Amino acid sequence: MELVAELLQRPSPVPLDARVFLQVHAELMGPIYPFAGRWRTVSLHKGDGPTRWPLPPGGIQPLMDVLERDVLSRSPLLSEDDEKVFSYAAEVMCEFLALHPFREGNGRTAFIVANLIFMQNSMLPLTTYERRSDEMRYLAACEAGRLGKQYRPLAMLLMEWEDRAVAQWRASHE
């Protein structure tokens, strides 16, 4: 992504805010959806089930303001302790996904922002998410974060995926 590359080239690490999510989403989904880079204005359903993410009366922006105040304000998180980095990335992803602020592309946007957090900490971006084998664990981990603010399950998955990314990088550079 050009945006992430540009953010990483800045002289100091870029703090996360709602604009970063909007920009990532616009760049990622812009070629596909006319509503890319804008908060959703509709309730969301998964399949034929009930409304899963109702549209709040005040819209999405007030919820993003809370996310900025309570979570994103601690960015950029720079740490030599990888566990702190994974824990923070998991919290950002879980809290963002709990809001589901876009009509489409929330998961992909969350992964790209997590990769920005990792790369700001000299870690590799995640490239090894295996949908078939990891999807149920990933969804369960996100649900644990959404319902109970339990971020550790997702942090553990992120660590596992980072280990895979490192192993792939090493194998390709031997």
Residue locations for each model-derived region?
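FIC/Doc superfamily catalytic core
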Residues: 1-174
